[in-house]
Amino acid sequence: MRKYLLSALLLTLSAQAAAAVEESTPSGFSVRSRATVAATPAETWAMLGRIGEWWNDEHTYSGKAANMRLELKAGGCFCEALPARSAGPSGSIEHGRVLTAMPYDMLVLDAPLGPLQSQAMVGRFSWTLRAAAGGTEITQTFVAGGYARGGADKLAPIVDKVLAEQLEGLKRRLAR
């Protein structure tokens, strides 16, 4: 019985995305997460473009990830529609803009996510896909630099946690 519990624990731990703050200074930081999914690079690429199906609702402005879209082409928008409040107009947020779209290999966005937009920060958000035994290895990286009130190093662990959570959402969605 103990052998089976240990095996289950090891499987659970290995299934979680490996995340880490790689570097952190008052003027910037780099975070990276990795996960292997049981999907082809083509299937993984397509799911990146269906971001509203796997991004966490709690990390949106509208409260619904279904309001998000990500166009998988250079110049494409990583945007969120904001529903109208009462009789007022609807709104929108550009979370990022696609800089590089290399199908099945790499997607890079200029994306000062969330609270970084109101700081003097630049953010590069990328996913690299590599065929691996039984699926695809995804490396998700976010690099930010510039001025942040109180220091960017204070933001690094928060961004790392939030983005690792999104990679887990992508992994879960691809497992269906």
Regions inferred by a protein language model and the residue ranges of each:
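Glycine-rich portal/gate segments that line the openings of hydrophobic small-molecule binding cavities
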Residues: 53, 65-113, 176
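Bacterial N-terminal signal peptides
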Residues: 7-14
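Soluble non-cytosolic domains of exported or imported proteins
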Residues: 35-42, 88-89, 119, 153-164
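Beta-strand/loop substructures that line and gate deep hydrophobic ligand-binding cavities in soluble
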Residues: 114-161
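A short, structured loop/turn motif at beta-sheet edges
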Residues: 38-43, 72-73, 99-106, 128-137, ...
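Hydrophobic ligand-binding cavity/cleft-lining segments
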Residues: 17-69, 73
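Hydrophobic/aromatic beta-strand elements that line small-molecule binding cavities or substrate pockets
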Residues: 33-35, 67-68, 93-100, 123-131
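Bacterial N-terminal signal peptides that target proteins for export
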Residues: 1-6
